[in-house]
Amino acid sequence: MAASVPPGGQRILQKRRQAQSIKEKQAKQTPTSTRQAGYGGSSSSILKLYTDEANGFRVDSLVVLFLSVGFIFSVIALHLLTKFTHII
């Protein structure tokens, strides 16, 4: 009878080390941000409107608040108007 080799051993350890090194290499090669991956687009985007260096459109936060609340009230008013006009 031939002596059987126990499970595991040097070949398994070598395969595990090789798989671990492949994973480490892939982790080092993948970009960590979307800008590095090429998904960021150009740097002259809509975010330039909100930077201090931009010559873009500047709106005070209070104006944005009033406009958004006014929009919400107009939508509610239109819903109520259509609800009451369909009853009559």
Swiss-Prot record:
Q: Which domain of life is it from?
A: Eukaryota
Its localization reads: Endoplasmic reticulum membrane
Please list the residue ranges that the record places on the Cytoplasmic side of the membrane. Answer: 1-61
A Pfam family that this protein carries is Sec61_beta
Keywords from UniProt, A to Z, are: Endoplasmic reticulum, Membrane, Protein transport, Translocation, Transmembrane, Transmembrane helix, Transport
Gene Ontology terms for molecular function: guanyl-nucleotide exchange factor activity
Q: Please, what other remarks does the record include?
A: Present with 414 molecules/cell in log phase SD medium.
- Which protein family is it in? Belongs to the SEC61-beta family.
**Xref: PANTHER family:** SEC61 SUBUNIT BETA
Question: What's its job?
Answer: Part of the Ssh1 complex, which probably is the major component of a channel-forming translocon complex that may function exclusively in the cotranslational pathway of protein endoplasmic reticulum (ER) import.
Protein's name according to its UniProt entry? Protein transport protein SBH2
Gene name of the record: SBH2
